[in-house]
């Protein structure tokens, strides 16, 4: 087996939650901000599915990261910073996705302002997590 | 909202449980099987002085991967190693491909003897 398999898996899988959460925030944010827009419902529907898929994508990202580091939860230096962002981000994304999935109304209903703010926070946290992950790969 | 919080806690709990399991597995001895060369070979001397010197060498060269008490960290637990003294010496000298670097340039034959004596003392 390739000794770098799990590092490669982690590198591949992390991009799904990063992209999908950012995408979800952009879509739901645009739909919330432009409430008179004709395609508002389409934006919220896409935001809904992006968030759910992004949350599903966190699982392989987290599992591959844990296997790669042999179970290290925090670590040292840059890895520690990466993990300090990663764990709250993971918890928040899963919680938000469940919140949206169990919410009343159809998938293209306008979500609450609190929800949009929470997704915005998740988008910032996932970006920071990705930044510090990248620092370990290409940083000096 | 409560369900979301429970889901978040469950996700973190699962990650923690996986972490504990992975760290436990990482601390197990290596899967490599040693040959029973000790049937044919003289054992490395194991005086207390040699073991103490080996401990020093271990802390300098090995503890950052195998833990200060040799019970494993990034590298496996070194207590009650299987295989002969020669197997241990060769592993230190040549490393394990993809897992452990070679120490041929860093350690001399005396250091290897001391390290082997120390590792053999670990029960």
Predicted feature locations:
Chain A
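Polytopic transmembrane helical bundles with strong interfacial aromatic enrichment
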Residues: 1-140
């Amino acid at each position: 087996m390739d000794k770098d398999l799990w590092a490669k898996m982690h590198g591949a899988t992390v991009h799904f939650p990063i992209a999908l959460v950012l995408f979800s925030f952009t879509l739901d944010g645009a739909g919330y901000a432009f409430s008179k827009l004709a395609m508002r419902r389409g934006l919220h529907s896409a935001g809904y599915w992006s968030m759910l898929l992004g949350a599903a994508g966190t699982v392989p990202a987290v599992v591959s990261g844990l296997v790669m580091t042999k179970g290290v939860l925090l670590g040292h230096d840059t890895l520690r910073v990466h993990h300090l962002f990663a764990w709250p981000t993971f918890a928040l994304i899963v919680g938000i996705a469940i919140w949206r999935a169990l919410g009343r109304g159809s998938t293209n209903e306008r979500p609450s302002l609190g929800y949009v703010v929470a997704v915005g926070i998740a988008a910032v946290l996932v970006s920071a997590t990705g930044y510090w992950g990248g620092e370990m790969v290409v940083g000096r | 909202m409560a369900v979301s919080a429970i889901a978040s806690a469950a996700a973190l709990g699962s990650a923690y449980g996986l972490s504990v399991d992975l760290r436990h597995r990482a601390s197990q001895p290596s899967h490599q099987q040693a040959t029973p060369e000790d049937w044919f070979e003289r054992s490395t001397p194991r005086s207390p002085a040699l073991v103490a010197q080996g401990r020093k060498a271990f802390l300098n060269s090995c503890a950052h991967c195998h833990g200060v008490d040799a019970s494993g960290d990034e590298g496996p637990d070194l207590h009650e190693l299987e295989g002969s003294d020669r197997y241990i010496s060769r592993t230190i000298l040549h490393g394990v491909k993809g897992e452990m670097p070679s120490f041929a340039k860093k350690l001399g034959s005396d250091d290897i003897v001391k390290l082997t004596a120390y590792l053999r003392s670990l029960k």
